[in-house]
Amino acid sequence: MTKLTVKDLDLKGKKVLMRVDFNVPIKDGVIGNDNRVVAALPTIKYVLEQGGKAILFSHLGRIKKAEDKPGLSLAPVAKHLSDLLNQEVVFPGKTEGKELEDAIDKLKDGQVLMVENTRYEDVDANGEYVKRESGNDPELGKYWADLGDDLFVNDAFGTAHRSHASNVGIASNVSKTAAGFLMEKEIKYLDEAVNNPKRPFVAVLGGAKVSDKIEVIKNLLSKADKVIVGGGMSYTFSNAKGVKIGNSLFEADKVSLAKEIMKEAGDKLVLPEDSVAAESFANDVPTKVFENGIPDGWMGLDIGPKTIEKFKNTLKGAKTVVWNGPMGVFEMSNFANGTLELGKFIGSLTSEGAATIVGGGDSTAAVSQLGIADQFTHISTGGGASLEYLEGKTLPGIAAISDK
């Protein structure tokens, strides 16, 4: 996929519109985790070093009524970004209007301005939920596009699966849209892994629900050499095989689909053989390992030791690994072992030359919490976006980037 990147643009003296993903957790004005802000720094710094004027757009949270606005201002993010860049970030606190336009006109080369939360535009002056941003209102996309010099850099992979005014809307009103470094990296690793992998290619899928991952399982079964399924969703497959699952979470309406997938997949699909179970959903209760089924009154909350070994054997020698979703309830220490062991093992394959990609969402949180994030080739910043990419879908935010 050869898309235009920020390095292909002449930025000197230009007002460069940039979509970043600064949708970070904020409590009482304090940012909880600034990973997304830090991830955008290389692209922002590059634009400034090239003598461009960076005009940043991002959403923060969801805004459905006027009362949502004050707690979801990007002001704390602008302040934090100015600390990280060691320079002022101009923040007029507006999404449109004369004050914003004047502030942009006053920018000098190498300066940064942040537009207020783009989702402020989802609620109008009368408090009506009009979704101008998230509904990709054509007038808003054109208005924002006109604030710059016909250049747009999209570095927000986390919103690439959405068609909003601040990504697709701006892109459709400028002649050149380029990928920022973060977007470029995401496309490179996910695209290569799914469409041109070094083999053997093993996909590892976890998480609670089969329904969330059906399309991913189907797409990856057609591309990977093996697909490992663990986590809560594996109990729907166990039930479909006629194995007792006790009180474990499963989706009754997906059992026939699980049967169908198993029949089509044959030995390509690798499923757990044992579980760590408890009598209630809590960390401080006695646990037991069950093989070949879980008795009534017990619920499976992590993969067991035999399964860990089985999955490691499947992964041995893999040259590409895509991992999406934890193997158990990793937030509770008693049920984190499967995710930790498998994570460490996948991490060790990186040093043997494998491309190891963690595909967003819970698995990203898991590797960070377990302190093993630095052991992988690439950790995706997009939850829903990486999932849809792994499903084989075309993401509107990426489709809107100009081809070289």
From Swiss-Prot:
Substrate binds at residues 21-23, 36, 59-62, 119, 162. Gene3D superfamilies: Phosphoglycerate kinase, N-terminal domain. InterPro entries: Phosphoglycerate_kinase, Phosphoglycerate_kinase_CS, Phosphoglycerate_kinase_N, Phosphoglycerate_kinase_sf. Coiled coil: none annotated. It holds the Pfam family PGK. Its EC number is 2.7.2.3. One of its GO terms (biological process) is glycolytic process. GO terms for molecular function: ADP binding; ATP binding; phosphoglycerate kinase activity. It comes from the Bacteria. It catalyses: (2R)-3-phosphoglycerate + ATP = (2R)-3-phospho-glyceroyl phosphate + ADP. ATP binds at residues 213, 300, 331, 360-363. Keywords: ATP-binding, Cytoplasm, Glycolysis, Kinase, Nucleotide-binding, Transferase. It is found in: Cytoplasm. It is an enzyme of class 2 (transferase). Belongs to the phosphoglycerate kinase family. Pathway: Carbohydrate degradation; glycolysis; pyruvate from D-glyceraldehyde 3-phosphate: step 2/5. Monomer. This is Phosphoglycerate kinase. One of its GO terms (cellular component) is cytosol.
